[in-house]
C-alpha cells in the first residue's frame, strides 16, 4: 500500500493551491449540495398560491386543503428517518442524488394530477425527497467546510430554500394568468426541472471526507480536505481529528485501511443516542430537538404557506394584490437570509438566535394584535391596522431569516459527534418536518378556533419560551472544530451544575 496522502502533502507543500482557490472549492461544494434546497423551497412557495386555484378547481374543503398543504412534511418523516442510515450506507453524495430523484418524480406526479388522491400520491413521493434533502445538505456541507467558514457555508441550504420559495411565489404570480385548470399544474410541474440540474451537478461533487474516513479511504479523504481547507496543515489536522473521533489509531496512515470495529461501529448508535447517552450527548440531543421545535412551532410555515390568506384577512381583497404581497414576503425573506448567512461566523450562532427570536416575538405580538383589531371591526377599513399587519409579516420573516432560519441548520449539523451525526441530525429533521406538517395542517382550523390574530399570539408565546430556552441551554459553537463539540457541551453542562451548586452553597452559608 502507498503511504497516506497526509504524509505526501507535507512534502509537496510548494504545490499547495492558493487559499482563494480552496475557498472557492468549498463554496462550490456547498452550492451543489444546496441545490436540493431550491427544489424544496420551490415546492413550499408554489403551494401557497397554487392552493388557491387547486381548491377552486378540485372543489376542496378547508380540511382537505390543510391536509394537502401540510402532508408533505408528514410524508417527509419517511425520508428523514431513512436518511441517516442511507447516507452512512451510500454516502452523502449519492443520498443527495436519491433526494433529487424523489423530487423529480413527485413534481411530475403533482403536475399531471387529475384529482385529489392523485396529487396526494405526488405529495408523498416529493415528501420523501424533502426528508432526505433537509438532513443531508447541511450535514454534507458541515463535513466539507473548514471551521473558519463552516457557519457561512452550512447556511447555504437555508438560503437556497428561500430562493426556491421566492421562485415559487413568482411562478404563482405568472402562471395565475393561465386558465385555472392549467395554471396550478404548471406551477407544480415546473418543480421537476431543477432536479435535472441537481443530478448533473452532483457528478462534480466530492464525497464527504468524514464518510470516506469511516470507509477507511484515508487517501481520498485527505484529497478532499486538502482542497477545502485553508492550509495544508489544517487539512492534516482535520484528518487527524476525524481519525481520532472515529477511533482510528494515529499510526494507521495508509491510503486505504480496514477501520477497526467497522462492522459493529453502527450497531450501538441509537443506543448511545437515545437509550444510554452520555451527559454531553444528551445535552446535544435536547439542544438539537429544542431548536428544531422552536423554529417551526413559532409559526414560520403558517406565514410561508398561507401568506395570501393572511393578507386577505388583513384587508387585501384581490388575488393579484395578495400574490404580489406574497412575492414581497419572499424577497424580504431571501434578502435577510443572505444577511444572516454573512454574519453567522462573525457574530456567532447564539447571538443571532437570541436576536432573531426576540424580533420574532415582537413581530408576532404586533401581527396578532393588528389582525385581532381588524377582525373585531368588520366593514371598516383601518389603514393603520392593515399597514401594521403587512409590515409585521415582513419583519417577522426578516427576523426569522437573520437567525432562526439559517442557524438551526448550522447548529444542528455541527454539534453531534461524527459517529452519531447522521442519525442525530435526522432526528432533528424529523421533528422539524413533523412540526411543520402540524402547523400546515392545522393553521386554518386554529385560525377559526382562536381567530387568526389569536393564532399568531399563540406563536408569539412559543417564541418567548424559545428565547428563554436558547439563552439558558445553548452554548456558542462558532469556530469550534466538529470533533470538539462533545467536549464543549460536556463542559457547558458541568459549568452550569457548578454554578448552581455554588449558588446553593452561598444560600446555605448565608443562612
UniProtKB/Swiss-Prot annotation:
Superkingdom of the source species: Eukaryota
Membrane topology: Multi-pass membrane protein
Transmembrane portions of the chain: 27-47, 63-83, 94-114, 124-144, 151-171, 186-206, 284-304, 324-344, 351-371, 384-404, 424-444, 454-474
GO cellular component terms, A-Z: plasma membrane; pollen tube
Record keyword Calcium present: no
Pfam families: Sugar_tr
MF GO annotations: carbohydrate:proton symporter activity
PROSITE patterns the UniProt entry points to: MFS, SUGAR_TRANSPORT_1, SUGAR_TRANSPORT_2
Cellular location(s): Membrane
Major subcellular location class: membrane
CDD domains per record: MFS_PLT
Record-annotated disulphide pairs: none
Protein keywords: Membrane, Sugar transport, Symport, Transmembrane, Transmembrane helix, Transport
NCBIfam families associated with the record: SP (TIGR00879)
Similarity annotation: Belongs to the major facilitator superfamily. Sugar transporter (TC 2.A.1.1) family.
Function recorded in the entry: Plasma membrane sugar-proton symporter.
Identification of the protein by name: Putative polyol transporter 1
Protein's organism: Arabidopsis thaliana (Mouse-ear cress)
Organism lineage: Eukaryota, Viridiplantae, Streptophyta, Embryophyta, Tracheophyta
Gene: PLT1
Amino acid at each position: 500500500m502507498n503511504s497516506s496522502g497526509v504524509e505526501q502533502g507535507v512534502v509537496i507543500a510548494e504545490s499547495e493551491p492558493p487559499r482563494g482557490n480552496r475557498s472557492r472549492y468549498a463554496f462550490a461544494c456547498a452550492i451543489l449540495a444546496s441545490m436540493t434546497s431550491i427544489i424544496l423551497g420551490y415546492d413550499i412557495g408554489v403551494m401557497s398560491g397554487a392552493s388557491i386555484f387547486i381548491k377552486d378547481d378540485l372543489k376542496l374543503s378547508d380540511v382537505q386543503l390543510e391536509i394537502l398543504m401540510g402532508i408533505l412534511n408528514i410524508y417527509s418523516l419517511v425520508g428523514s428517518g431513512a436518511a441517516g442510515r442511507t447516507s452512512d450506507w451510500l454516502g452523502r453524495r449519492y443520498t443527495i442524488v436519491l433526494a433529487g430523484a424523489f423530487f423529480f418524480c413527485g413534481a411530475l406526479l403533482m403536475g399531471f394530477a387529475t384529482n385529489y388522491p392523485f396529487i396526494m400520491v405526488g405529495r408523498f413521493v416529493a415528501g420523501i425527497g424533502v426528508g432526505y434533502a433537509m438532513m443531508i445538505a447541511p450535514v454534507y456541507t458541515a463535513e466539507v467546510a473548514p471551521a473558519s467558514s463552516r457557519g457561512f457555508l452550512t447556511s447555504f441550504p437555508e438560503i437556497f430554500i428561500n430562493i426556491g420559495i421566492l421562485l415559487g411565489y413568482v411562478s404563482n404570480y405568472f402562471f395565475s394568468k393561465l386558465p385555472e385548470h392549467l395554471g396550478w399544474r404548471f406551477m407544480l410541474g415546473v418543480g421537476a426541472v431543477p432536479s435535472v440540474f441537481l443530478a448533473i451537478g452532483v457528478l462534480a461533487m466530492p464525497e464527504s471526507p468524514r464518510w470516506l474516513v469511516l470507509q477507511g479511504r484515508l487517501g481520498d479523504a485527505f484529497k478532499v480536505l486538502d482542497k477545502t481547507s485553508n492550509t495544508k496543515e489544517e487539512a492534516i489536522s482535520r484528518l487527524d481529528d476525524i481519525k481520532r473521533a472515529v477511533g482510528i489509531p494515529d499510526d494507521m496512515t495508509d491510503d486505504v485501511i480496514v477501520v477497526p470495529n467497522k462492522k459493529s461501529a453502527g450497531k450501538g448508535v441509537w443506543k448511545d443516542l437515545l437509550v444510554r447517552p452520555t451527559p454531553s450527548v444528551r445535552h446535544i440531543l435536547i439542544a438539537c430537538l429544542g431548536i428544531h421545535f422552536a423554529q417551526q412551532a413559532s409559526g414560520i410555515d403558517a406565514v410561508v404557506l398561507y401568506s395570501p390568506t393572511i393578507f386577505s384577512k388583513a384587508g387585501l381583497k384581490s388575488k393579484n394584490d395578495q400574490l404580489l404581497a406574497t412575492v414581497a414576503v419572499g424577497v424580504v425573506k431571501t434578502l435577510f437570509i443572505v444577511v444572516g448567512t454573512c454574519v453567522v461566523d462573525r457574530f456567532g450562532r447564539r447571538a443571532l438566535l437570541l436576536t432573531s427570536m426576540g424580533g420574532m416575538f415582537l413581530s408576532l405580538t404586533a401581527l396578532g394584535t393588528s389582525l385581532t383589531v381588524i377582525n373585531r371591526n368588520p366593514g371598516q377599513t383601518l389603514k393603520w391596522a392593515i399597514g401594521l399587519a403587512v409590515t409585521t409579516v415582513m419583519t417577522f420573516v426578516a427576523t426569522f431569516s437573520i437567525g432562526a432560519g439559517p442557524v438551526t441548520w448550522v447548529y444542528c449539523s455541527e454539534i453531534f459527534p461524527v459517529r452519531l451525526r447522521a442519525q442525530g441530525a435526522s432526528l432533528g429533521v424529523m421533528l422539524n418536518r413533523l412540526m411543520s406538517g402540524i402547523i400546515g395542517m392545522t393553521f386554518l382550523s386554529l385560525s377559526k378556533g382562536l381567530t387568526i390574530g389569536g393564532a399568531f399570539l399563540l406563536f408569539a408565546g412559543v417564541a418567548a419560551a424559545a428565547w428563554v430556552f436558547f439563552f439558558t441551554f445553548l452554548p456558542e459553537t462558532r469556530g469550534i472544530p466538529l470533533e470538539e463539540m462533545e467536549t464543549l457541551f460536556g463542559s457547558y453542562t458541568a459549568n452550569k451544575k457548578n454554578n448552581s451548586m455554588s449558588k446553593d452553597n452561598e444560600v446555605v452559608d448565608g443562612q
